Amino acid sequence: MDKKTSRLRRAIRARKKIQELGVNRLVVHRTPRHIYAQVINPEAQVVAAASTVEKAVKEQLKSTGNVDAAKAVGKFIAERAIEKGVTTVAFDRSGFKYHGRVAALADAAREAGLQF
């Protein structure tokens, strides 16, 4: 089993547990160049989204693949989710380690007002 398959298996296991809770989830995906975040409701509809690909986010950054970029995305996703009336979420790290950019995004979202 390779690294990606292991990560996807962890992600599926976590998503099943979140699905049983029936709450909104903050999903994070990262690539070496970008980081993406979405708030998805229990009916699997995207409520809010933010990423380093977006022009509004990218203009504020020097680089899109670092911790500062993840913090910016965390702040944007929290603002957009709260704007739509979502304040409480479950954090879905998609099988990635809670470390570095993933942790930075989560901390920034918490500071901006999301609860998880």
Swiss-Prot record:
InterPro entries: Ribosomal_uL18_bac-type (IPR004389), Ribosomal_uL18_bac/euk (IPR005484). Keywords: Ribonucleoprotein, Ribosomal protein, RNA-binding, rRNA-binding. The keyword Repeat does not apply. Gene3D superfamilies: 3.30.420.100. GO terms for cellular component: cytosolic large ribosomal subunit. The keyword RNA-binding applies. GO terms for molecular function: 5S rRNA binding; structural constituent of ribosome. CDD domains: Ribosomal_L18_L5e. One of its GO terms (biological process) is translation. Belongs to the universal ribosomal protein uL18 family. This is one of the proteins that bind and probably mediate the attachment of the 5S RNA into the large ribosomal subunit, where it forms part of the central protuberance. PANTHER family: 39S RIBOSOMAL PROTEIN L18, MITOCHONDRIAL (PTHR12899), LARGE RIBOSOMAL SUBUNIT PROTEIN UL18M (PTHR12899:SF3). Part of the 50S ribosomal subunit; part of the 5S rRNA/L5/L18/L25 subcomplex. Contacts the 5S and 23S rRNAs. This is Large ribosomal subunit protein uL18.
